Structure formats: structure tokens, C-alpha cells
Amino acid sequence: MWDNILGHSAQKQFLQKYLYADKRPHALLFCGIGGLGKRMLALEFAKTLLCKSHTGNDDCESCRLLRNINHPDLILVEREEDEKKRFKDINIAQIRELINQSAFAPVMSKTKVCIINDADKMVVQAANAFLKLLEEPPAGWVIILIADSVDKILPTILSRIVQLKFYPIENSLVEQIVRKQGVENERAAALARISEGSVGTAVRLYRGDGLKADLFTYREQALMFLQSVPLEQPLNYLSRQLWTDKNFLHREAVVTVQLLQLLLRDLLMCKLQLYDKIYNVDILDILRNQSQRWHIASLKKALGIVQETYTALVNNVGVKAAMEAMTIKIDLLYKE
């Protein structure tokens, strides 16, 4: 069952038993890092739960409606976007609307399924209102919360739900999926390692979702910088560098810095001859050659500089200022 979702066999077994249990919890929490397929499995589980035959094989009207997220017995609560396409936290109005819907009985099934995606991104007022719903759950409801972490979920909510933890899947499975997207073998292996077992992350990085280019374009920029150090004329270099251009987006800068951090880490692994720990396996020969130009102490300091830059960007320091400062600091470090 749910063979279209790779991995997570233990979680699937739990949900299969849930389908036929006489007594079952009314609320579940799917918890684990982003990109593991938690939302996809929640929807597949809801489809099976609402299906008359409990097969979810798309043969009935219920399955077809749910596949299009148009089922009268499915409530899907998700974060909304603001005018700048940034996701906002789940607000009190969304939870109040959910509470209003709890007054209505299921239409096509004996069950109504409510899925709250990014449940760890609720504002406090929304979380408190949702807690009241959990304390007196509507008859026939199955509530599924989806979260990357439990740290920001109220303890009083956690005490009333059953947690189902999701873990990163094997790199070989991630490789298998991204190859189907048309990625060549060596790059698929690199994507699997960089995404650390998160299929969603691997696919987004390959497609460049929300960015102007894909992962490998930004990695090439970061690698070219490391290959250019020491800079003969830093100011001239900066004037030509894409990441100090005024049109370079904040999210592009964040991705570039993260990739630069991985490259520096890989150079350090090469110095230590820990080749099985390398993320960017598709450019291993290049990394080996580049590592010969660096001292271990310098690589560790450079990693610190890049981490400082990432923190600055997360705290909304200007992209141009942050990237220029990082470039100059790493160049000076290499010249010491």
C-alpha cells in the first residue's frame, strides 16, 4: 500500500493497522525534517481512509475527488502567502474556520479528515484555539498534524496526539527518484548526499524552485570563487561577481552560502582523506586538487566565516554587504 511513496515502511505499517483498528487515536502528528514526503503520505492515507473499500486505488468518486484536493470530507489547512510570496504563519482566522467546520457531519464518508500542514508554524493564538478543538474532538474526525519539528508545538497539544516520526531515507532511494527527473548518475548521487535523505529537498534543489537557476549553477559560482582565491584585485573581482549584484536575490545568496559551506567542508574531508564523507561526489577530483591549496586551519576558519555570513543573511543583513564582507574575509584569510 502507498507504493508510490518510497521508504517509511514502519510508518506505513502503523497507518495500515490504524485503518482497521477498533479503537484509534483521533489525532496524529507526522514529524520529521522537510521534504520527506509527510504531506504526500498524509493525503494518500486520507484518500484510503475515506475510500469506501479502504484501498485508495482511485477507482471510486471519493478517491478522484481527494486526488484533486476537492473532497467534501477533507479539510486542508496550510500557510498562506503574503504579497511578496513569503509564507505566513497559520493564523487564528484559519483555525476559527476549522472550528466552524467541526459543526458539520461528513458528507460522503463516516469520517472527516483534517490535515494541518506546517503545524509548528501556528501563531500562539491559533495554537491555543486549536487546543480547545483537540480537548473536545468532533465525532468521526481524524486530525493529522504535519511538522518539521515538535519544538514549537505546545506541550499541551503534544500530550493529546500520537507522534509518528519520519526519518531521512537511504541515499540510494533519493538517487533513484532524482534520476527519474532526468539527473545524470553522478549528479544524482551528489543531490542525494546534499539533501541528506530528503527527497523533496533534492528535487527542489535540482529544479531550482523559487530561484533563477538550479543547484549546480550556484555551486559553480561558489566553486569558481574558491578556485580564484587568492584574488589579485579583490575590488575588481567583486564588481564582476554575480552574488554582489543588486539583483541577486536574498534566497539566492542563502543557497550560495550553504553550498560554499558544503564545498569548504568537502575540502576539509579531502585533507583528512575521509572521501566517503564528501557531499559533492560528482566533482571529487576537482575537490582533491583544490584541497592541496589549503591548510586545515584555514579551512576551519573559512567555514566559520561562511557560517557568520549565513547567520547575517538569516537576520536580514543586506545581501551585497554580507557577500562582499565574506568574499574579502576569505581572501584575506587565504593570504595570511
Describe every region a protein language model picked out.
Residues M1-T48, L65, A139-W141, S149-L259, ...:
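Charged, glycine-rich active-site and insertion segments that engage polyanionic ligands
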Residues M1-Q125, S291:
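Clamp-loader machinery-focused feature within the broader ASCE/P-loop NTPase space
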Residues N117-D118, L145-V150:
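A short beta-strand-to-loop transition that corresponds to the Sensor-1 phosphate-sensing loop
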Residues N100, K132, P155, S159:
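Conserved adenine-binding aromatic site and its adjacent loop/helix in ATP-hydrolyzing domains
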Residues N128-L145:
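Conserved catalytic/switch belt of AAA+ P-loop NTPases
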Residues V123-K132, L313-A321:
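A short, hydrophobic/aromatic-rich structural module that often spans a beta strand
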